[in-house]
């Protein structure tokens, strides 16, 4: 494996390297592929192998556990990764055989052409041009359009297999009653299916309750779905700023995010070379990529919001759609009459996109061009199958401002815009807050379902308190777990650097793991079928002191092993029936196992064994004189 580019070495398309750590399989795991109805539907999953349980009757087999895998080919040792060439175009044949797209002879965006013709960018540019597709004249190429016509696409079948996580392999094993046991959940009206079928995926997309972000110009992406009747997903934000980061850094963050479980990635770059950075990320990403196009549009007018125009924004949308961006955050709900409502707030308008559009509205004293040109935007979206992520530009930036008039006025508008997008068969999800105390979170979910007609909700946290800079991944994960339980379909992660600085690769991992916990906790609370299998497997391994299995089944095997080995580094300690927390004499699980072993030896129940043990101790106390404190 080649060494990553040094921070001191200038990035070029000759020396671009993948992060070595990102291509290592996770411990005791292997990539497997489940074939669908056709040979080119190969759905990736991670198989975690477990060791046997030692019993008095010999070894007891523990089955492998299958988990959702977002890492793409990076963790497949049989795949050669070279980020200079990008990933294989998995969906290219599916897109081509539908016959409703055409290959463009050139780029449609004037800005893209300008960047392509700039010789100064030659060494920085991703140098393998993928063919650029566009819908044939009059065609609509969205997954929603196909679903509404009753078509089950290969993407939909792929998703159904992926969501089921090969659960039938565990469910069919009668010996695995422990693994299959699951507490009933409370789904708050969600339609949770025992098994996900391609027909169910199609129907959820058709009615707008779920989206499949899958731009026809991002054939490298492995299909996934966002909707409250499916597994809760998480998004990772990356991106450079005017003050730091590079293309190499951002590609590393993307590969690191998907390794640990990021279902989608948003490139929020606001610094140099946004266009080139995004191309490298998309060509190497197996997960959907989202952006906020107004950020780049603002750079094109040197940061002067009042100089933005519809024409500049339109060209930016086309530029990014032809690169392969899968969903756009567009703050079309920031309307002129709503801006005065924010005057009474503690923290005003905290959304970057929201503040840009608010400034434009005030400078021109007009409705936002995002709002007035919304149907024009829909025409662009359906020509490439880009999904809307309707931005919450007026989200609360403090607990003080939670659930106020401005926030909910915008939410109603987003519901109106959703209906317009659906008339064009364009897929939509709705962005949500923000900073909200725990007792006000449920209202956000209820009103979103009401105003936005059950379109998927995508929330940033929410942060449940404002007093913990440096720990906002925790303050927000509390709210994320709650709102995920209530029905949010995707959670946008928050890193420990939130409000403080640009996250690095380690911060990305911390944010991902924290939000994987929140999303999984929500799946458990909803009663999502099979959600508890991994918990049960890890608990069984913990009780049986199978330390390596505990590490391998965890969300972060490396950290679990590192913490254990800080005090018990010897390899033999991974076979010990205790850890450094309680030591050998006070381990509750060891004591329970001793009781079970004694009961088995004596041919009695565990209850009787405990009673006999109590009686022996009572006799021992009396025989020693019945003194509360014995003299040495």
Curated annotation (Swiss-Prot):
Family matches, as InterPro entries: ThiC, ThiC-associated_dom, ThiC/Bza_core_dom, ThiC/BzaA/B
Gene Ontology CC, one term: cytosol
GO biological process, one term: thiamine biosynthetic process
Pathway this chain belongs to: Cofactor biosynthesis; thiamine diphosphate biosynthesis
Assigned EC number: 4.1.99.17
Residue runs in coiled coils: none
Any one Gene Ontology molecular-function term assigned to this protein's record: zinc ion binding
UniProt-listed HAMAP family: ThiC
Name of the protein: Phosphomethylpyrimidine synthase
Organism phylogeny: Bacteria, Pseudomonadati, Pseudomonadota, Betaproteobacteria, Nitrosomonadales
């Amino acid at each position: 494996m080649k060494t990553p580019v040094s921070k001191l070495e200038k990035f070029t398309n000759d020396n671009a390297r993948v992060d070595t750590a990102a291509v290592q399989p996770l411990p005791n795991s292997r990539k497997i592929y489940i074939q669908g109805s056709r040979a080119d539907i190969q759905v990736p999953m991670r198989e975690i192998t477990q060791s046997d349980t030692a019993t008095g009757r010999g070894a007891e087999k523990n089955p492998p556990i299958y988990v959702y895998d977002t890492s793409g080919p990076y963790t497949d040792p049989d795949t050669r990764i070279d980020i200079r060439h990008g990933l294989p175009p998995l969906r290219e044949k599916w897109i081509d055989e539908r016959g409703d797209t055409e290959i463009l002879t050139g780029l449609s965006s004037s800005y893209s052409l300008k960047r392509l013709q700039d010789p100064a960018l030659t060494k920085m540019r991703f140098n393998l041009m993928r063919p650029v597709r566009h819908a044939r004249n009059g065609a609509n190429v969205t997954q929603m359009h196909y679903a509404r016509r009753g078509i089950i696409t290969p993407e939909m079948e792929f998703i159904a297999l992926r969501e089921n996580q090969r659960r039938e392999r565990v469910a069919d094993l009668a010996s695995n009653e422990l693994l299959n046991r699951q507490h009933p959940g409370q789904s708050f009206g969600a339609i949770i299916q025992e098994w996900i079928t391609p027909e169910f995926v199609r129907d959820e997309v058709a009615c707008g309750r779920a989206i499949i972000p899958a731009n026809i110009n991002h054939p490298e992406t492995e299909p996934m779905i966002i909707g409250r009747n499916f597994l809760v997903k998480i998004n990772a934000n990356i991106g450079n700023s005017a003050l730091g980061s590079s293309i190499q850094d951002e590609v590393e963050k993307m590969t690191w995010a998907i390794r640990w479980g990021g279902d989608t990635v948003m490139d929020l770059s606001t610094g140099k070379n946004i266009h080139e950075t995004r191309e490298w990320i998309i060509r190497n990403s197996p997960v959907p990529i989202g952006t906020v196009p107004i950020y780049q549009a603002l750079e094109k007018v040197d940061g002067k919001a009042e100089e933005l125009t519809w024409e500049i924004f339109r060209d930016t949308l086309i530029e990014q759609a032809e690169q392969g961006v899968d969903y756009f955050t567009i703050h079309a709900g920031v309307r002129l009459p709503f801006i005065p409502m924010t005057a009474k707030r503690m923290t005003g308008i905290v959304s970057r996109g929201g503040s840009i559009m608010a400034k434009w509205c005030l400078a021109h004293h007009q409705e936002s061009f995002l709002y007035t040109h919304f149907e024009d935007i829909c025409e662009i979206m359906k020509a490439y199958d880009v999904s809307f992520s309707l931005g919450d530009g007026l989200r609360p930036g403090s607990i003080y401002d939670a659930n106020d008039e401005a926030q909910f006025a915008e939410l109603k508008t987003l519901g109106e815009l959703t209906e317009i997008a659906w008339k064009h068969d364009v897929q939509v999800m709705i962005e949500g807050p923000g900073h909200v105390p725990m007792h006000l979170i449920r209202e956000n979910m209820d009103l979103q379902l009401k105003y936005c007609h059950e379109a998927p909700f995508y929330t940033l946290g929410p942060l449940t308190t404002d007093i913990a800079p440096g720990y906002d991944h925790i303050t927000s994960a509390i709210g994320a777990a709650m709102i995920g339980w209530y029905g949010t379909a995707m959670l946008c992660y928050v890193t420990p650097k939130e409000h403080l600085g640009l996250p690095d690769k380690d911060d990305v991992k911390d944010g991902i793991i924290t939000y994987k916990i929140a999303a999984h906790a929500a799946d458990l609370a909803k009663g999502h079928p099979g959600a508890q299998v991994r918990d049960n497997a890890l608990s069984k391994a913990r009780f049986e002191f199978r330390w390596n299995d505990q590490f391998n089944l965890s969300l972060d095997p490396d950290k679990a092993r590192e913490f254990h080995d800080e005090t018990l580094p010897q390899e033999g300690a991974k076979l010990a029936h205790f850890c450094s927390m309680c030591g050998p004499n006070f381990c509750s699980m060891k004591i329970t196992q001793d009781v079970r072993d004694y009961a088995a030896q004596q041919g009695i129940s565990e209850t009787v064994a405990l009673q006999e043990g109590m009686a022996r101790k009572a006799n021992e106390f009396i025989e020693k004189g019945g003194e509360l404190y014995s003299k040495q």
